[in-house]
A protein has these predicted regions:
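Hydrophobic transmembrane alpha-helices of multi-pass small-molecule transport proteins
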Residues: 123-140
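Glycine-/small-residue-enriched transmembrane alpha-helix faces in small-molecule transporters
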Residues: 1-36, 145-169
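Transmembrane alpha-helical segments that form core, pore/gating elements
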Residues: 26, 49, 145-203, 212, ...
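Loop-to-transmembrane-helix transition segments
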Residues: 7-12, 60-84, 148-155, 205-239
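Helix-helix packing/entry segments at the starts of transmembrane helices
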Residues: 40, 98-103, 171-186, 238-265
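Transmembrane alpha-helices of multi-pass small-molecule transport proteins
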Residues: 32-80, 159-162, 166, 183-199
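C-terminal transmembrane-helix exit sites in multi-pass transporters
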Residues: 104-126, 263-265
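Hydrophobic/aromatic residues within transmembrane alpha-helices
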Residues: 28, 37, 41, 88-89, ...
Length: 265
């Protein structure tokens, strides 16, 4: 397979996995607080990576890294992107939030020019623009009235852009599986920090679905819910994270960005 096709396939299938994750999180947004959902997702994803995928790569030594700072900043970028996007879909429809968030490929292309010194020609620029317009035609978000919550997917897009610029600029020596593993470790740690902080703050969030989703108290979880988190959230995010990390590590960000829209086809 042509190397470019390999990168395109990785980014398209990776973003499809992310879409499955987003739909599942939307379904849980009225039932379980975000930090609890991210905690279980991280536990399951780490287990999948450690005990299902990692043995094929030589075991725990494969997780060795000489650049922990790189993984911390990537982890914070992903946590930021996920948090702001998932808060937004507690209030907005998934179509509306996605329409705003999918400014990200255009941002990635622009940032790649300035921070990675990538040459972005007319074809790549047009590909991004056509992809964005095509996305609007597919999901038909309608008229998005301006509300404060509408800014959140845009903030998520900025964090998502930062993630891939960091990966492309500093991740050449890191393995995709390693990057995926440490992202889930960041989710595990931050979910517990958020849970503890919100518990101590005792925030009254009854008037806002988004605030309730962000700060709510943990709830009991059924076996079916755990299975749904495993299959609909943890498994897709584990596979998608590895695929997208591989793509942005090995291919120019401005080349890949338009293909982020491919998940919508």
């Amino acid at each position: 397979m042509n190397n470019n096709y390999l990168g395109i396939s990785a980014i398209v299938f990776g973003t499809i996995c992310f879409s499955v994750n987003d739909i599942s999180v939307k379904l849980f947004s009225s039932e379980m607080p975000l930090n609890q959902l991210m905690f279980f997702r991280a536990i399951f994803a780490i287990s999948i990576l450690l005990f299902v995928i990692l043995p094929f790569y030589g075991g725990f030594k494969y997780l060795n890294t000489n650049n922990p700072t790189f993984h911390i900043f990537r982890g914070l970028a992903v946590v930021g992107a996920n948090t702001f996007f998932f808060i937004s879909i507690a209030e907005l429809s998934l179509a509306e939030a996605t329409a705003i968030f999918f400014i990200a490929p255009i941002l990635i292309t622009i940032f790649a020019m300035f921070f990675l010194q990538e040459k972005v020609g007319i074809r790549r620029g047009l590909a991004c623009l056509i992809g964005f317009l095509g996305m609007l035609l597919i999901i038909k978000p309608g008229t998005i009235s301006f509300e404060l919550i509408s800014i959140f997917p845009l903030i998520a897009a900025l964090f998502y852009t930062a993630l891939h610029i960091i990966t492309r600029k500093y991740g050449s020596q890191e393995k995709p599986l390693t990057m995926g593993f440490y992202i889930q470790v960041c989710f595990l740690v931050t979910s517990l920090m958020f849970a503890g902080g919100f518990y101590l703050a005792d925030i009254d969030a009854e008037q806002s679905n988004a605030l309730t989703f962000l700060t709510g108290s943990w709830v009991s979880v059924s076996t079916f819910d755990m299975f749904h988190i495993l299959v609909g959230i943890a498994l897709p995010i584990s596979i998608g994270g590895i695929l997208v990390s591989y793509a942005y590590k090995n291919y120019e960000a401005s080349f890949l960005a338009p293909f982020e829209y491919g998940a919508l086809v």
